[in-house]
Amino acid sequence: GLKDIAIFGGNDYTCFGFMKAALESGYKIPDDFIIAGYDNLSFCEIFTPELTSIATDFHELGKKSIRIIENMVAENSDSFGNISMIPVEIKIRNSTNSKN
C-alpha cells in the first residue's frame, strides 16, 4: 500500500506542489506516505504539514565554490571534475513523522 512509499523531492518547491496535489486528492501526509525535500526554505515550517527538509549552508557552499574557481584559474586548469562536500543537516518535521 501507500504506507510504504517515501517521496524525496530535489527541492522544497517540488515537494510543496506534490503535497498540495496529494492533499487536494484526499491523501494524508504523513499517514498515507512520507515526503522530504531539499533546501530547508522558510516555507517548510509554514506549510501544513511542516515539510522535512535537508538544510545546506549555502554561504559555505558559495565560499567553497569560489575557492575551487580561484584554484582552477591559478593553475590554468580546464578541468571540471572537482568533487567537493559540505555538511548538511536534516530538519525532521511532520511530513515524515507518522504516528501510525
Predicted feature descriptions by range:
Residues 1-100:
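Flexible loop/turn connectors
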